Amino acid sequence: MSKITEKIAKLLALAESPYEEEAKAALLQARRLMAEHKLMPEDIEPQENKKVVQECVGVTCTKLSSPWTVYLSTLIAAHYCCRPYRSSVHGSKVSEIGFIGMEDDFKLCKLAFLYAYDCVASRCRQIRTQKGYPAKTLREMCNSYGWGFCRGLSAAFQKQEAEHQEWGLVMVVPQAVEDAVSKMKRSSYKISPQSSINRQYAAMGYADGQEFDMRRRLEPSA
């Protein structure tokens, strides 16, 4: 699995563009590779020889500045055999994103999440350079784009699942991970989109996700 992890890491590094189409291509391709190799018994290492990793990944968020980040972590974790969680100091509005998963799964999940997050963050930086808008409006544009990106990626994942229903047999969260999650203190966190959505920016990410051909851009090297 270490070779597979390395191959997928290289795949994620292939796309130099910060735009969402490249991010979705890399994420979808990485997931396809992971699922395909898990379907090959000779490439699977015994899970009992691996450890459960619980670790934050260095990305913080608040309900005001980047509420879509939690949704993104939930979406990606579900497709990389991991579970997401948030870590925060009592009384603080800032949360840090973390994941729990088997060692190899965690590495892939972390790579995928950070890559997707960086792509959204890069576009948000571009949005904030626009002149003539108050800070509140720019924030709404950025958050709307973030929600759109997540929904577009979700649609792409759903399409992939429909095309490869057999992956559902292997793309599951290991019981050891579920056991670790059950021991954690749970906290509620509403991740519904804000009421003020900029439809133009939300539609931008969603449409890109719906129209994207996941095999068109990036193919792994032999």
Regions found by a protein language model. Give the residues of each.
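Long alpha-helical, hydrophobic tracts
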Residues: 1-54
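Extended, helix-rich structural scaffolds rather than catalytic motifs
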Residues: 39-222
